């Protein structure tokens, strides 16, 4: 069974990746194991701000961000009758994606790119570029 890490952030690009993924799954003979991941950058410790936030308010913030990032992707997967295991992490986005792919023994990483403008090498997304360099499994980037 194919084991896939599907990475989302709630953006239009990540929703396009989920829609593309759903189309790919329809062509498969066997339903893959799907790990749906969203990663948040840590709240910076600017001027003692992180110390001023309680663990409860920080947890609430990350939960709200997670719910927002996952909402559309979960709806698209549910509509396509694709089950998934949800993961929400805090940390460096690219290294967290690669770490979780390894931990879950994923066969591939599936994710969207950022806008591809005139400076596509820079804008493709430092996250997408870093994942490509760090990953030991195939990475599917959907534009």
Pin down the residues of each PLM region.
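Small/aliphatic-rich secondary-structure junction motif
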Residues: 2-53, 82
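Phosphate- and divalent-cation-binding pockets in alpha/beta enzyme and binding domains
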Residues: 16, 96, 118
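Structural beta-alpha unit
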Residues: 75-109
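General small-molecule cofactor/ligand-binding pocket signal
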Residues: 35-37, 85-89, 140
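Gly/Ser-rich helix-loop-strand patches that form or flank binding pockets
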Residues: 3, 99-143
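Class I S-adenosyl-L-methionine
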Residues: 22, 71-78
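A short acidic, glycine-rich active-site loop
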Residues: 54-68
């Amino acid at each position: 069974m194919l084991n896939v890490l599907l990475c989302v952030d709630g953006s239009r690009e990540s929703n396009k990746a989920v829609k593309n993924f759903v189309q790919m799954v329809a062509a498969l003979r066997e339903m893959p194991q799907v790990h749906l991941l969203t990663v948040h950058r840590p709240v910076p410790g600017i001027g003692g701000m992180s110390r001023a936030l309680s663990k409860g308010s920080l947890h609430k913030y990350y939960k709200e961000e997670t719910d927002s990032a996952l909402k559309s992707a979960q709806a698209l997967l549910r509509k396509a009758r694709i089950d998934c295991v949800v993961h929400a992490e805090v940390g460096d986005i690219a290294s967290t994606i690669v770490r979780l792919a390894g931990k879950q023994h994923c066969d591939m990483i599936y994710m969207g790119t950022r806008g591809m403008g005139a400076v596509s090498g820079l804008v493709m997304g430092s996250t997408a570029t870093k994942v490509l360099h760090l990953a030991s499994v195939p990475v599917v980037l959907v534009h």
